[in-house]
Protein backbone atom coordinates (compact mmCIF):
# COMPACT_ATOMS: atom_id res chain seq x y z
CA UNK A 1 0.00 0.00 0.00
CA UNK A 2 1.56 3.30 -1.08
CA UNK A 3 1.37 6.48 0.95
CA UNK A 4 3.02 9.88 1.18
CA UNK A 5 4.48 11.42 4.34
CA UNK A 6 4.35 15.19 4.72
CA UNK A 7 6.32 16.72 7.60
CA UNK A 8 5.27 20.29 8.48
CA UNK A 9 8.30 22.15 9.84
CA UNK A 10 7.52 25.70 10.92
CA UNK A 11 10.65 27.65 11.82
CA UNK A 12 9.10 30.06 14.32
CA UNK A 13 8.39 28.68 17.79
CA UNK A 14 7.58 30.71 20.88
CA UNK A 15 9.17 28.29 23.33
CA UNK A 16 12.01 27.03 21.13
CA UNK A 17 13.02 29.40 18.29
CA UNK A 18 14.33 27.68 15.16
CA UNK A 19 13.02 24.37 16.48
CA UNK A 20 13.40 22.23 13.32
CA UNK A 21 17.14 23.01 13.24
CA UNK A 22 18.06 22.38 16.87
CA UNK A 23 20.97 19.98 17.09
CA UNK A 24 20.34 16.49 18.43
CA UNK A 25 23.57 14.55 18.64
CA UNK A 26 25.09 16.03 15.51
CA UNK A 27 22.02 16.33 13.28
CA UNK A 28 19.21 18.88 12.96
CA UNK A 29 16.00 17.58 14.51
CA UNK A 30 14.16 17.71 11.18
CA UNK A 31 16.70 15.28 9.70
CA UNK A 32 16.02 12.77 12.48
CA UNK A 33 12.29 12.99 11.68
CA UNK A 34 13.05 12.55 7.97
CA UNK A 35 15.04 9.41 8.73
CA UNK A 36 12.21 7.91 10.79
CA UNK A 37 9.82 8.58 7.92
CA UNK A 38 12.16 6.85 5.47
CA UNK A 39 12.08 3.74 7.65
CA UNK A 40 8.27 3.59 7.31
CA UNK A 41 8.37 2.59 3.64
CA UNK A 42 6.58 5.71 2.43
CA UNK A 43 6.54 6.15 -1.33
CA UNK A 44 7.39 9.83 -1.02
CA UNK A 45 8.42 12.11 1.85
CA UNK A 46 8.06 15.88 1.69
CA UNK A 47 9.12 18.42 4.30
CA UNK A 48 6.81 21.45 4.19
CA UNK A 49 8.56 24.51 5.56
CA UNK A 50 8.45 28.29 5.46
CA UNK A 51 12.17 28.86 6.02
CA UNK A 52 15.16 28.60 3.69
CA UNK A 53 17.51 27.30 6.40
CA UNK A 54 15.21 24.35 7.08
CA UNK A 55 14.98 23.66 3.36
CA UNK A 56 18.77 23.65 3.03
CA UNK A 57 19.19 21.23 5.94
CA UNK A 58 16.63 18.82 4.47
CA UNK A 59 18.09 18.99 0.97
CA UNK A 60 21.60 18.40 2.37
CA UNK A 61 20.24 15.16 3.82
CA UNK A 62 18.79 14.17 0.44
CA UNK A 63 15.21 15.09 1.31
CA UNK A 64 12.46 16.72 -0.74
CA UNK A 65 11.19 20.17 0.28
CA UNK A 66 8.04 22.11 -0.52
CA UNK A 67 8.24 25.79 0.43
CA UNK A 68 5.00 27.01 2.00
CA UNK A 69 3.58 30.29 3.26
CA UNK A 70 4.49 31.50 6.74
CA UNK A 71 0.96 32.54 7.72
CA UNK A 72 -0.71 29.13 8.08
CA UNK A 73 -2.67 28.73 11.31
CA UNK A 74 -2.22 24.95 11.54
CA UNK A 75 -0.19 22.05 10.23
CA UNK A 76 -3.19 20.82 8.24
CA UNK A 77 -3.40 24.12 6.38
CA UNK A 78 0.28 23.75 5.50
CA UNK A 79 -0.43 20.22 4.25
CA UNK A 80 -3.23 21.54 2.06
CA UNK A 81 -0.83 23.88 0.31
CA UNK A 82 1.49 20.95 -0.42
CA UNK A 83 -1.42 18.83 -1.68
CA UNK A 84 -2.30 21.53 -4.20
CA UNK A 85 1.27 22.28 -5.27
CA UNK A 86 1.99 18.57 -5.82
CA UNK A 87 -1.43 17.95 -7.43
CA UNK A 88 -2.07 14.77 -5.46
CA UNK A 89 -5.15 12.81 -6.52
CA UNK A 90 -8.05 12.83 -4.05
CA UNK A 91 -7.48 9.20 -3.05
CA UNK A 92 -3.77 9.63 -2.20
CA UNK A 93 -3.09 8.52 1.39
CA UNK A 94 -1.10 11.18 3.23
CA UNK A 95 0.41 10.84 6.71
CA UNK A 96 1.14 14.00 8.67
CA UNK A 97 4.24 13.43 10.82
CA UNK A 98 5.06 16.27 13.19
CA UNK A 99 8.45 17.89 12.63
CA UNK A 100 9.22 17.87 16.36
CA UNK A 101 8.97 14.08 16.85
CA UNK A 102 12.54 12.83 16.30
CA UNK A 103 11.82 9.58 18.17
CA UNK A 104 8.61 8.62 16.39
CA UNK A 105 8.65 4.88 15.55
CA UNK A 106 8.43 4.12 11.84
CA UNK A 107 5.94 1.35 12.66
CA UNK A 108 3.24 3.77 13.75
CA UNK A 109 3.71 5.94 10.66
CA UNK A 110 2.94 2.84 8.62
CA UNK A 111 0.16 1.80 11.00
CA UNK A 112 -1.87 4.98 10.58
CA UNK A 113 -1.55 4.75 6.78
CA UNK A 114 -2.71 1.12 6.80
CA UNK A 115 -5.63 1.89 9.11
CA UNK A 116 -6.85 4.66 6.82
CA UNK A 117 -6.47 2.56 3.67
CA UNK A 118 -8.63 -0.20 5.17
CA UNK A 119 -11.58 2.11 5.93
CA UNK A 120 -13.94 4.35 4.03
CA UNK A 121 -13.16 7.35 6.19
CA UNK A 122 -11.35 10.58 5.50
CA UNK A 123 -9.07 10.64 8.53
CA UNK A 124 -7.32 8.27 10.95
CA UNK A 125 -5.07 8.73 13.96
CA UNK A 126 -3.60 6.87 16.95
CA UNK A 127 -3.73 6.88 20.74
CA UNK A 128 -2.01 5.16 23.66
CA UNK A 129 -3.47 4.01 27.00
CA UNK A 130 -3.26 6.30 30.03
CA UNK A 131 -2.47 4.51 33.28
CA UNK A 132 -1.83 7.27 35.83
CA UNK A 133 -4.02 10.05 37.12
CA UNK A 134 -1.34 12.72 36.65
CA UNK A 135 -1.44 12.24 32.89
CA UNK A 136 -5.23 11.98 32.86
CA UNK A 137 -5.48 15.39 34.54
CA UNK A 138 -2.73 17.06 32.48
CA UNK A 139 -4.30 19.51 29.98
CA UNK A 140 -1.28 19.11 27.69
CA UNK A 141 -2.15 15.42 27.28
CA UNK A 142 -5.08 15.37 24.87
CA UNK A 143 -7.61 12.68 25.71
CA UNK A 144 -9.93 10.90 23.28
CA UNK A 145 -13.01 8.75 23.86
CA UNK A 146 -14.17 6.25 21.26
CA UNK A 147 -17.33 4.47 20.18
CA UNK A 148 -17.66 0.69 19.86
CA UNK A 149 -16.15 0.73 16.35
CA UNK A 150 -13.07 2.75 17.28
CA UNK A 151 -14.25 6.11 15.98
CA UNK A 152 -13.65 9.28 17.99
CA UNK A 153 -16.57 10.66 19.96
CA UNK A 154 -14.59 13.62 21.32
CA UNK A 155 -11.08 14.93 21.95
CA UNK A 156 -10.38 17.12 24.97
CA UNK A 157 -7.72 18.57 27.21
CA UNK A 158 -10.12 17.85 30.06
CA UNK A 159 -10.21 14.50 31.85
CA UNK A 160 -12.53 12.33 29.77
CA UNK A 161 -14.20 10.05 30.56
CA UNK A 162 -14.83 11.25 34.12
CA UNK A 163 -14.55 8.21 36.40
CA UNK A 164 -16.94 9.44 39.09
CA UNK A 165 -16.39 6.74 41.71
CA UNK A 166 -12.65 6.21 41.26
CA UNK A 167 -11.78 9.92 41.20
CA UNK A 168 -13.88 10.53 44.31
CA UNK A 169 -11.50 8.19 46.13
CA UNK A 170 -8.46 10.20 45.02
CA UNK A 171 -6.69 7.24 43.41
CA UNK A 172 -3.36 7.73 41.62
CA UNK A 173 -4.18 5.27 38.84
CA UNK A 174 -7.00 5.30 36.32
CA UNK A 175 -9.15 2.50 35.00
CA UNK A 176 -9.63 1.27 31.46
CA UNK A 177 -10.86 3.44 28.57
CA UNK A 178 -8.46 6.33 29.13
CA UNK A 179 -6.52 7.16 25.98
CA UNK A 180 -4.00 9.87 25.13
CA UNK A 181 -4.17 11.07 21.56
CA UNK A 182 -0.99 11.06 19.49
CA UNK A 183 -0.45 13.91 17.05
CA UNK A 184 -0.08 11.78 13.94
CA UNK A 185 -2.77 11.79 11.26
CA UNK A 186 -3.57 9.94 8.08
CA UNK A 187 -5.84 11.59 5.51
CA UNK A 188 -6.91 11.17 1.94
CA UNK A 189 -5.88 14.20 -0.08
CA UNK A 190 -9.47 14.94 -1.04
CA UNK A 191 -10.40 15.13 2.63
CA UNK A 192 -7.67 17.72 3.26
CA UNK A 193 -9.08 19.82 0.43
CA UNK A 194 -12.50 19.73 2.07
CA UNK A 195 -11.19 20.35 5.58
CA UNK A 196 -9.50 23.65 4.80
CA UNK A 197 -12.71 25.00 3.26
CA UNK A 198 -14.64 24.51 6.51
CA UNK A 199 -14.89 27.37 8.98
CA UNK A 200 -13.12 26.74 12.28
CA UNK A 201 -15.57 25.45 14.87
CA UNK A 202 -16.35 26.94 18.32
CA UNK A 203 -15.12 23.78 20.06
CA UNK A 204 -11.86 23.94 18.13
CA UNK A 205 -11.29 27.47 19.43
CA UNK A 206 -12.17 26.55 23.02
CA UNK A 207 -9.92 23.48 23.23
CA UNK A 208 -7.33 24.64 20.65
CA UNK A 209 -7.58 21.25 18.93
CA UNK A 210 -7.97 21.41 15.16
CA UNK A 211 -9.27 17.81 14.89
CA UNK A 212 -12.50 18.95 16.55
CA UNK A 213 -13.39 20.72 13.32
CA UNK A 214 -13.78 17.27 11.73
CA UNK A 215 -16.25 16.06 14.36
CA UNK A 216 -18.12 19.39 14.32
CA UNK A 217 -18.95 18.89 10.65
CA UNK A 218 -20.15 15.33 11.18
CA UNK A 219 -17.15 13.48 9.76
CA UNK A 220 -15.52 10.44 11.37
CA UNK A 221 -11.99 9.95 12.66
CA UNK A 222 -10.80 6.39 13.21
CA UNK A 223 -8.53 5.93 16.24
CA UNK A 224 -6.37 2.83 16.78
CA UNK A 225 -4.12 2.00 19.71
CA UNK A 226 -0.53 2.56 18.60
CA UNK A 227 1.61 -0.54 18.11
CA UNK A 228 4.51 1.29 19.78
CA UNK A 229 4.58 4.17 22.22
CA UNK A 230 6.51 7.08 20.69
CA UNK A 231 9.34 8.76 22.53
CA UNK A 232 9.35 12.32 23.78
CA UNK A 233 8.40 15.11 21.40
CA UNK A 234 10.22 18.44 21.54
CA UNK A 235 8.20 21.49 22.65
CA UNK A 236 10.50 23.11 25.21
CA UNK A 237 14.23 23.40 25.98
CA UNK A 238 13.69 20.83 28.73
CA UNK A 239 12.19 18.39 26.23
CA UNK A 240 15.18 18.93 23.96
CA UNK A 241 17.67 18.02 26.67
CA UNK A 242 15.65 14.92 27.55
CA UNK A 243 15.55 13.78 23.92
CA UNK A 244 19.27 14.38 23.48
CA UNK A 245 19.94 12.14 26.46
CA UNK A 246 17.54 9.42 25.28
CA UNK A 247 18.96 9.37 21.73
CA UNK A 248 22.59 9.34 22.79
From Swiss-Prot:
One of its GO terms (cellular component) is cytosol. Gene3D superfamilies: Spore Coat Polysaccharide Biosynthesis Protein SpsA, Chain A. The keyword Cell division does not apply. Keywords: Cytoplasm, Lipopolysaccharide biosynthesis, Nucleotidyltransferase, Transferase. GO terms for biological process: CMP-keto-3-deoxy-D-manno-octulosonic acid biosynthetic process; lipopolysaccharide biosynthetic process. GO terms for molecular function: 3-deoxy-manno-octulosonate cytidylyltransferase activity. Its main location: cytoplasm. It holds the Pfam family CTP_transf_3. Its EC number is 2.7.7.38. It catalyses: 3-deoxy-alpha-D-manno-oct-2-ulosonate + CTP = CMP-3-deoxy-beta-D-manno-octulosonate + diphosphate. Pathway: Nucleotide-sugar biosynthesis; CMP-3-deoxy-D-manno-octulosonate biosynthesis; CMP-3-deoxy-D-manno-octulosonate from 3-deoxy-D-manno-octulosonate and CTP: step 1/1; Bacterial outer membrane biogenesis; lipopolysaccharide biosynthesis. It is found in: Cytoplasm. It comes from the Bacteria. InterPro entries: Cytidylyl_trans, KdsB, Nucleotide-diphossugar_trans. The keyword Cytoplasm applies. Belongs to the KdsB family. This is 3-deoxy-manno-octulosonate cytidylyltransferase. It comes from Shigella flexneri. The lineage of its organism: Bacteria, Pseudomonadati, Pseudomonadota, Gammaproteobacteria, Enterobacterales.
Amino acid sequence: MSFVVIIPARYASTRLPGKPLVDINGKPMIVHVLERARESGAERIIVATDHDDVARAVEAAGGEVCMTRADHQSGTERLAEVVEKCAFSDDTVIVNVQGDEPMIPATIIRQVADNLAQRQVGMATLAVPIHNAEEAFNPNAVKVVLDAEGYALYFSRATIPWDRDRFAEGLETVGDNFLRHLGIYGYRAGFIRRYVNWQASPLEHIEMLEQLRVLWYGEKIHVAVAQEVPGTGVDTPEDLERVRAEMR
